[in-house]
Amino acid sequence: LHHYDGAISPQEIMREYIDALPSGSYVALSHFLDPQTEEHSELARRMEETFLHSPMGTGRFRTRDEIEGMMAGLELVDPGLTLCADWWPDGPRIKPLPPVSYCIAGAVGRKP
């Protein structure tokens, strides 16, 4: 949905998708994130502008609240909505994250 820029809200699209799933289903979502910090929001705005002028034509960075709204009605699995880079299976991070890693988040949710 991070490349979707249509008339229907992404929250409505996800609501319809989630409603069609049986109870007990899991939904995984990753999305471009505007982290709402001075340093990283500026990077998100520059990347969004780059996407607009690329063959993709779109790339929308949404806030944490907007992304969480796409998962409404789901029980988020720990750690909830977090930076994708924080889903590390190999132990603690050794090097600092590159700035772009602060601009994509993901979550997994279970439909009750």
Regions picked out by a protein language model, each given a short descriptive name:
Residues L1-P112:
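Alpha-helical subdomain
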